[in-house]
């Protein structure tokens, strides 16, 4: 499965548009508590613990996106957009969402 942020794939023709697909992942409040406890990981203004959690959430969202595209018979997702949003009372959760257009490539 090809997943790309571009609207098309060079050298490949889109033969069918299957529809919009999306995947989401939410990091809960406990993750933030753990992250703040791990602030000692900070090197050069970056937290390795926080970055690992964001990467894991992004991978989950993209995996869900891929699974939904496969269910529609697609072999690629184009125009993928990743969004990050703070949710919940006291901003205790972070949502990572991925959306794009499932397509069939020639």
Swiss-Prot record:
Against SUPFAM superfamilies, the record matches this protein to:
YbjQ-like
Q: Which residues are connected by disulfide bridges in this protein?
A: none
Instruction: Extract the InterPro entries matched here.
Output: UPF0145_dom_sf, UPF0145_YbjQ-like
Family annotation (HAMAP family): UPF0145
Q: What's this protein's family per the entry?
A: Belongs to the UPF0145 family.
Please report the name of this protein according to its UniProt entry: UPF0145 protein Daci_3728
Q: What is the lineage of its organism?
A: Bacteria, Pseudomonadati, Pseudomonadota, Betaproteobacteria, Burkholderiales
């Amino acid at each position: 499965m090809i997943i790309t942020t571009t609207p098309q794939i060079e050298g490949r023709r889109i033969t069918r548009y299957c529809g919009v697909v999306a995947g989401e992942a939410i990091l809960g409040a406990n993750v933030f508590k753990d992250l703040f406890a791990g602030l000692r990981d900070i090197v050069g203004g970056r937290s390795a613990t926080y970055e690992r959690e964001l990467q894991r959430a992004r991978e989950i969202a993209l995996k869900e996106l891929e699974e939904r595209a496969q269910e529609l018979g697609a072999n690629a997702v184009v125009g993928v957009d990743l969004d990050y949003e703070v949710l919940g009372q006291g901003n205790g959760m972070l949502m990572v969402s991925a959306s794009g257009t499932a397509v069939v490539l020639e």
